[in-house]
C-alpha cells in the first residue's frame, strides 16, 4: 500500500487550461494531464529558478519528492511538444 499524499502548498495561477498544436482540433489530439503539483514544480524550478531545496520547502514537501515532480512534469511537457499532443493544465491552482 502506498503512503498517502502530503498536503502541498501551491501558489501558481494557470493562465489557460490547454496547450495544443496550432491548427488541429483538440478533439483529434491525444491529451496529457499535467497535475497541479507538477505545474507548481515547473514554475518554481524552471521559471522562478529556485533551488530544489528552496522550492521543496515552498511546497511543503521533501527535496526528493520535488525532484520526482519536476522530472515528471518535464517528461510530460517534452512528450506533448515532440509528439504533437495536447497538454491539459490544472484549473484548480489558485494563489494562496
UniProtKB/Swiss-Prot annotation:
Protein name per UniProt: UPF0251 protein Shal_3723
Family according to the record: Belongs to the UPF0251 family.
Protein species of origin: Shewanella halifaxensis (strain HAW-EB4)
Pfam families named among the record's database cross-references: DUF134
Record-linked InterPro entries: UPF0251 (IPR002852), WH-like_DNA-bd_sf (IPR036388)
Record-linked HAMAP family: UPF0251
PANTHER family cross-referenced by the UniProt entry: PTHR37478, UPF0251 PROTEIN TK0562 (PTHR37478:SF2)
